[in-house]
Amino acid sequence: MKKTPNYLEDRLCLNVLANSVENAKACYEAAQGHVVLGVLSKNYATDEAAIEDMKRYIVATDNALSVGLGAGDPNQSAMVARLSEVLQPQHVNQVFTGVGASRALLGQNDTIINGLVSPTGTVGMVNLATGPLSSQAPAGIVPIETAIALLKDMGGSSIKFFNMKGLTHLEEYKAVATACAENDFYLEPTGGIDLENFQEIV
């Protein structure tokens, strides 16, 4: 099965949460395949239960599965890495510090892995302390260009800029988008995106 998302014009792919296999299939068909369907690891008590259920999504959507944390929960990082090793999905959501483990366990470079960084209130700077322990420590604020380079070092594919809260951090988002373009890196704006602000964000 294909391990990379099906981008529209090689540029854009939606990532939406699916609440059932049937819903995932409907979303996949509505988006003409230009979508990955998020299923949250946090919703499962065990790896085995998650793997069994997520395999159903893989079959229904031709592997357009996005293994999710659950509202960016850093405590799900290790579980996401373990699930991804078995499932080999098209897309993996990770906190910044979980990217390297996920890439190593996947054993291939096709799956897209994002690394979660947060807005700081300062244009051009992001917080990469989003892991299980680091998220409880003082912020790790670095230039967006440095965050991108670190993610590349770890085998990451994209920046997950979360939580955007819609257009609240628009100027910061523009700087992140510019840096991603200049450094040939994917960008995943996340948080508070709706039909009203979708076009402006894209």
Language model segments and positions:
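N-terminal amphipathic alpha-helix/helix-capping segment at the start of soluble metabolic enzymes
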Residues: M1-A30, I51-D53
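A short alpha-helix capping/helix-coil boundary motif
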Residues: T4, V59-A60, M125-L128, M154-S157, ...
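Residue-level marker for well-ordered alpha-helical positions
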Residues: V21-K25, E52, A78, E145, ...
